[in-house]
Amino acid sequence: MANFKGHALPGSFFLVFGLWWSVKYPLKYLNSKVKGNCRSNKCYERLELIEGILKAAFALIGILAEQFVPDGPHMHLVNGEDHSWVKLMNWQHTTMYLFYGISGVVDILTFLPLNLPRGLDRLSLGIAVIIEGLLFYYHVHNRPALDQHIHSLLLIAVFGGAISIMIEVFMRNDIVLELFRSSLTILQGTWFWQIGFVLYPLGGAPEWDQTDHGNVMFITMCFCWHYAVALLIMAINYSLVYCCVKRHKKLSSVVDNSLKKINSNKTEVEASLLAGSDEE
């Protein structure tokens, strides 16, 4: 959709997943340091299955929104009367959602007893991100300078994420790569919203001069600020997760010590009773 909603929708999807990953991966990493956490591993597997279902569902919502909004193409690619293309921008967004939907389906299939190759889920996600970058690279040709520039900045986050994910195919459970991907996903989410506010101002706000080089300079600086905020969010979430895990570990240790003490006292009582019965 060539409007504010068309950028807010994918921005919201990326933001939700980026924020979720910024909590999930630190939690998984810090819990992996605790011995005997088999139950947690099963829990994470279920969470990743749910994540795949949500990814496929979000992609389906995006496809339906792009195709069946009042001014959408309604699944028509070519106009039958003059043989012209119909709403190609909507079709590009639909294609992006399609590949993210495929990634979600692969995530789901990974947890079925099909013996799929290890890393296939990351590979499918990496392909989806590459397709997104390819589509947006040719999305704004022959458009005003500011429009081209603000979308080209998005490609930094897109292809940076794609490289990270492709490395994850071979290096699973690497916390640095996972956190890097999470930060770039948050950046994508906030930047989609920023594109919407710049190109389609709300509430009668003044329009941006698309040819002013000063605006191009500010948008570049603004992109760096967005990533700084993303890194701050990552740091805050990691710190909160660390405190929660540390507190939980401390409580578990207290409970374990209490149980050991109770069992020890119980053993001593039983031993004294047995000793008393032997004397009789």
From Swiss-Prot:
Membrane topology classification: Multi-pass membrane protein
Signal peptide segment: none
Membrane-spanning parts: 7-27, 49-69, 96-116, 120-140, 150-170, 184-204, 216-236
First-listed, main subcellular location of the protein, grouped into a coarse class: membrane
A single cellular component GO annotation: membrane
Keywords, in A-Z order: Membrane, Transmembrane, Transmembrane helix
Identification of the protein by name: Transmembrane protein 45B
Record family assignment: Belongs to the TMEM45 family.
Highest taxon, organism lineage: Eukaryota
A Pfam family annotated for this UniProt entry: DUF716
Subcellular location: Membrane
